[in-house]
Amino acid sequence: MTTLDSNNNTGGVITYIGSSGSSPNRTSPESLYSDSSNGSFQSLTQGCPTYFPPSPTGSLTQDPARSFGSIPPSLGDDGSPSSSSSSSSSSSSSFYNGSPPGGLQVALEDGNRVSPSKSTSNITKLNGMVLLCKVCGDVASGFHYGVHACEGCKGFFRRSIQQNIQYKRCLKNENCSIVRINRNRCQQCRFKKCLSVGMSRDAVRFGRIPKREKQRMLAEMQSAMNLANNQLSSQCPLETPPTQHPTPGPMGPSPPPAPAPSPLVGFSQFPQQLTPPRSPSPEPTVEDVISQVARAHREIFTYAHDKLGTSPGNFNANHASGNRPATTPHRWESQGCPPAPNDNIMAAQRHNEALNSLRQASSSYPPPWPPGATHHSCHQPNSNGHRLCPTHVYPAPEGEAPVNSPRQGNSKNVLLACPMNMYPHGRSGRTVQEIWEDFSMSFTPAVREVVEFAKHIPGFRDLSQHDQVTLLKAGTFEVLMVRFASLFNVKDQTVMFLSRTTYSLQELGAMGMGDLLNAMFDFSEKLNSLALTEEELGLFTAVVLVSADRSGMENSASVEQLQETLLRALRALVLKNRPSETSRFTKLLLKLPDLRTLNNMHSEKLLSFRVDAQ
């Protein structure tokens, strides 16, 4: 039984969904993360830590069973927030002396929030697992008219049968997709969906779920868990990196190595990654905050040459000599990556399959690799346990710096080691939902670096572990959006993935991503127009992550204090770099509500794909 979170719509992180959507034959990260299911699923996480993506809303409420997935607050039949949602205002930062810059107060308080104390009472669970409405996919409030349904669909069906309402004929041949965000648009199709899933006046009953039905539902959940277990266990031997010895890094001595960490990490593993709260340290000075955050951003959020364990000169020399990477397995074996002579062929096939699936929308595509580019696929972990995507050497044009290259060197060739999967690992004949999921999955390896960056924010580890996880779950998508804003070419209306493959806005819009991509382009244009330095970008990223108004915080006062410290440092740095542009800091802060809006749009887009895949 697939589970979802009925939390607020104040934002969250990237959620990666299965192609089966909310089919009862498959499980979801949300159900596997609940307290009661952890016991039966413990065998998965012990031998092979798996990536369970974070919740789009990102709030870690008092109920652990609702830690994953997202649904913005339930709406009534008239589109207004239902009784299960309540609005709460975020506290104003004392940094603004009670009056933040224009628009920021509204931006940080936009959207309705679900009070943890109220929302948990209206959620139906089975052994700790949240159940979904059979009609629209919202969180079920109980067993109504024969099926698990939300309050909105229960009331809609009750009015329909009691008043014998004859709804207007559907304009789309009665083929409307009924999801939470559009369930009020076509009432005829909604009533038809109610009947098709089994809602009936004769099915009204009182009391608890019968034992026989409860056992059947538990059996479905267990079979879904076993299926996920089998799939992950078959992948586990291929994903386990070699044990590495600690080596002192630029940020100080490395901690003792963890026993063979998996390249993919889930938010259920955060308590093992994050340090327990320590005694409050003396408040650092503004200069210390700027230097520490900038250094962490530079050394963690970089496409650094040293992450591959080889210098750019040596790498380029190997390619200049005409040696194919596939014919030099000793170079990769020395770094813990087994020789794979067919990696290039398989990688090219997967990439071409993904392109062929997208070419149906348009026939004008750039070549998969730029002329002269050399490619090798080796998903190897670096010294920090990060999973690196294939490396590429791109010749820069004569007299020009490489486009979108995070670092500019003296050499004409630039070594790019990105923390993202460079292309979807798909198959031919995929649906739009599957292609969208593949693109979302391309962000997976970057999540680990967000965790690592957070640990180096001064004062972050002083927070409780609960608040650390809550901030990470809620802010990871926004951090990644800031980080990859440079990949959006506003002038040409294209998106360049880190494989150097460029997709036009029109092509991706044909897949149903138009509104979300337009908002991403607008945000990228605004952010890039500020021309932030590396230090400013690092501090702004920290401010985005440490937001005191996230729902589910245990000690919001401590988070707010840390946020004020980061804001003071960011303001001092911005005014120091450009003292004449006094409004630059305010413009930068006004990007926070834009990020929150993007977060909400991304959450609803993934939710609609999940329900459509039923």
Swiss-Prot record:
PROSITE patterns: NR_LBD, NUCLEAR_REC_DBD_1, NUCLEAR_REC_DBD_2
Pfam families per record: Hormone_recep, zf-C4
Modified positions (Phosphothreonine) in chain numbering: T275
Pro residues bias (residue ranges): 239-262
Region (Crucial for activation of GJA1): 49-285
Residue ranges, annotated region (Required for phosphorylation by CSNK1E and cytoplasmic localization): 1-70
Binding locations of heme: C418, H602
Coiled coil: none
GO cellular component annotations of the record: cytoplasm; dendrite; dendritic spine; nucleus
Region (Disordered): 1-120, 233-286
InterPro entries named in the record: NHR-like_dom_sf, Nucl_hrmn_rcpt_lig-bd, Nuclear_hormone_rcpt_NR1, Nuclear_hrmn_rcpt, Znf_hrmn_rcpt, Znf_NHR/GATA
Compositional bias (Polar residues): 1-48
Modified positions (N6-acetyllysine) in chain numbering: K192, K193, K591
Span list, region Modulating: 1-129
Zinc finger (NR C4-type): 133-153, 170-194
Main localization of the protein described in the UniProt heading: nucleus
Oligomeric and partner information: Binds DNA as a monomer or a homodimer. Interacts with C1D, NR2E3, SP1 and ZNHIT1. Interacts with OPHN1 (via C-terminus). Interacts with PER2; the interaction associates PER2 to BMAL1 promoter region. Interacts with CRY1. Interacts with CCAR2. Interacts with SIAH2. Interacts with FBXW7 and CDK1. Interacts with HUWE1. Interacts with NR0B2. Interacts with NFIL3. Interacts (via domain NR LBD) with HSP90AA1 and HSP90AB1.
Entry comment, domain topic: Composed of three domains: a modulating N-terminal domain, a DNA-binding domain and a C-terminal ligand-binding domain.
Role noted for this protein: Transcriptional repressor which coordinates circadian rhythm and metabolic pathways in a heme-dependent manner. Integral component of the complex transcription machinery that governs circadian rhythmicity and forms a critical negative limb of the circadian clock by directly repressing the expression of core clock components BMAL1, CLOCK and CRY1. Also regulates genes involved in metabolic functions, including lipid and bile acid metabolism, adipogenesis, gluconeogenesis and the macrophage inflammatory response.
Protein family (similarity comment): Belongs to the nuclear hormone receptor family. NR1 subfamily.
The protein's name: Nuclear receptor subfamily 1 group D member 1
Name of the gene: NR1D1
